[in-house]
Structures are given as C-alpha cells and as structure tokens.
Amino acid sequence: MTLRQEKMPGGWAIDLFRDGRSISRLWIADRQMRIGSQPVKIGGIAGVGTDPALRNKGLASRVMEAALELMKREGYDASFLYGIPDFYHRFGFTTCMPQHSLEIETRRAECAQKMLKMRTAQKADYTTIARIYNRDSARRTASCWRDPKRWYGFPMGSGFGVPCKAHVALDHRDRVVGYVLYDDVDTHCRIAEVGGQSRAIFHTLLHDMARRAVRLRRPSLSLSLPPDHPFALFCRDYGCTDHTAYERNAGPMGRLVNLHNCIEKILPELAHRWRLFDREQVLAVRTDIGHFTLSWQGDTLHMERDAPRLAARLDQRALTELLLGYKTANSLKTNDQLAVSYTHLTLPTNREV
C-alpha cells in the first residue's frame, strides 16, 4: 500500500492506494478560524472514508495519522472535524463546540414586515456577503474568516452535502446589506446562516423566511444560530425556542497541532481576556505537546516557549476546550482535567461563548 499526499486548490488530498486504487482517504480544507478576534490557520478534515470491504483494518487511522503529520509540517495551528462517536479522540480530538438550533412557528414569523427588497444571491454579491459575514463575526470564536477577494460562495447548507441557496436584502440604492442562506430542500425550512445588522434587515429576512416556510407548508422554521446571535435576540420578540446540544466524544471536534504558533497568534485575544488587576501574575502552562509561559512586559503580553515545573498542567484537548470557550478553567479543575500548582493562578477565560 502506498500513501499519497497531493496539494489541491484550497487544501490537501490524502489517499492510501493499493494496486493503483484509492482504498482509504480524506481531505484537508484550508481555513482561517477565529479564536476571539484572532485568526489561526486550521485544517478542516472532511471526507474520511475507507472502502467497505477493507474497514476495521486500521486504514483510516493510517490516513488520519498522516494528515496530522502533514498539518504539523505545513504549519497548521489546529484542526477541526465533525466526528462519528468514539473514534477521533484516538488522534487527540475533543468535542469543543455546541450545536445550536432556533425554532420559530411559521404563523409567528409571518408577522414580520418586509421593509427592504429581496432577491436571489448572485456571484457578484459574494464579495459583499463575505464582508458582511466578517463584520458580523469579528469577535465570534470558531467563525471562519472569509477572504472577500477569493471567497467562492456557500459550499453547503446546514450540513455536509446539503444543497443551499441564498437570498440577499437590498437597501434603497440596491446595495446588498443582508443575506439569508437556506437549505435548498423541500422537507424542511432550515436557515444555515444569517447576515446583517439593522432591524429593517432583520424584519425583511424573517419575512422572507416565513414566506418560504409557507410555500413549503411547514409549521415552523429553524435556524443554525447560537442564542446570543443578534438575529436570535431579535427573534425573541416573535417567540422562539432555543435548543443547544453537547455531543459526547463526537460532533464538532478539534485539537491543537502547533501549540506555540497558535498561542503566539492569539496573544492579542489572551491579552483582551486577561483581567487588568492580574497583570502582575505569570501564567505557566505545561501540556502533552509543549509548554509555554505568558507574562506582561509593560502593556504587552509575551510568550516564552517553556514553562517551569510549577505550572498549570493540562493536555492539549483540555486547552482546546478552554481556548474555544467550551469549558472554563473551573470546570476543567472540577473534572480533574486541569492541575494548578498554586491557588491564586487565574486562567483567562473566553468572554465570547
């Protein structure tokens, strides 16, 4: 068997070949993902698969291990995937994001007024849509930065392989000021993404969603939005139900790949999280993939690539959960995932959960 790694537009393809045929494979998608306001380079793993007749022989594990080695060599800071239960923890991945759904009854959404014009999104709108998304998500952890010059549009709806279509809201000068992304299916009315910032935009988008739900003859519509999203807050006036799911060792999972590079890139975010009256403290951290020490020099937060024995100890999975705001330092301590050598140490926490 031969392992091949091929650079593709936007990422990598890794295949295990036998007799000239791919028998196990995956893709790595290049992305820039925010931790707070700071982008880090991530590899999104997708399409992990082995031919049915050859499963349970460790082939997928070989491909996954090759992917992690490649990402470390190529300077990726972290990696994320949507995992099946009880498999990807073997490669250091941990569940680190919740899954959100907001549901509104169609009859209530019909009360929203149309204040702006709407039309189907066009390729010429992609630059503006990317800019709206980046503006709306500027401090939202786990959102991906979209390059307005290169972003090619929405690859899918609310899930992998789900077809999609987008509508845009226009102001009085016919400029795109908001958008909504639908699952392009007839079985449900699902909204995968919403962009925009004014009440007029939100009214218009909800009106458009209600029209689609009526056309599909669905009693309710659902949105893939966290409860603190501005549009989710707007929808409270119409009555809605929020559902948040936390998977066990499955679902949205991630891991750090290059610890020091990642921490260096997010120093401005860690400085933002650090309480002003704690700046005299030094934060030393020891993990299974490396150590680091954070300290203030004047008004600047610095990192050293080592840590003394007297340090906070946690593995990279727990650190991933902490950086993404999935768990707090206190919850990690309670679960024996974080050992703190001295009681007054305070780890900066994510305020953007």
PLM regions and their residue ranges:
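Acyl-donor binding region in acyl/amide transferases
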Residues: T50-D77, G83, V185-A250, S331
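Non-catalytic peripheral regions of nucleotide-handling enzymes
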Residues: H229-H272, R279-L283, T287-W296
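Conserved small/polar residues in nucleotide/adenosyl-binding loops
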Residues: T343-T349
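Low-complexity, glycine/alanine/valine/leucine- and proline-rich hydrophobic stretches
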Residues: R275-T334, A339
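Active-site-adjacent scaffolding segments
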Residues: R21-R25, A29-Y133, S137
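Conserved donor-binding loop and adjoining core beta-sheet/short helix segment
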Residues: M1-K57, F160-F202
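Amide-forming acyltransferase catalytic core, primarily the GNAT-like/NAT-type
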Residues: Q99-G195, R199-P226, P252, L256-F277, ...
